[in-house]
Amino acid sequence: MDATMMHTPMTVQLILQHGAEVFPDSRVGTFDGESMRYKRYAEIAADAARLAAGLRALGVRPGDRVGTFSWNSTAHLEAYLAIPAMGAIMHTINIRLAAEQIAYVVNHAGDRVVLVDA
């Protein structure tokens, strides 16, 4: 008899891959302050994979901290998926802090890279 236990670990990487394969046309919507913007899950997965590859090219390795300084957006969602999927640690930085506080937080955390909203 099969148990109800899973045979595959539920890592962020496998959840992302599963979503892209099973629900490629499902959409994620974000409000940019003026209108809704939509992106397909397959596109988010592909962009997250590109981001992870870019971070690896910058020298980010499993266990390294990557800061994110961003509003809620699909780009930030892609970072939420890419960073832990590659084994790095995501460190969200409060965008409402003063510049000196941000500098302290980033330096104290030891972020290897900080992703910033443009």
How would you describe each model-predicted region?
Residues 1-6:
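A detector for short, charged/polar N-terminal pre-domain segments
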Residues 28-81, 98-103, 107:
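Conserved AMP-binding/adenylate-forming core of the ANL superfamily
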Residues 10, 42-46, 96, 115-118:
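Conserved phosphate-coordination/catalytic loops
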Residues 10, 21, 61, 107-109:
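Structured loop/turn residues at beta-strand edges in well-structured enzyme cores
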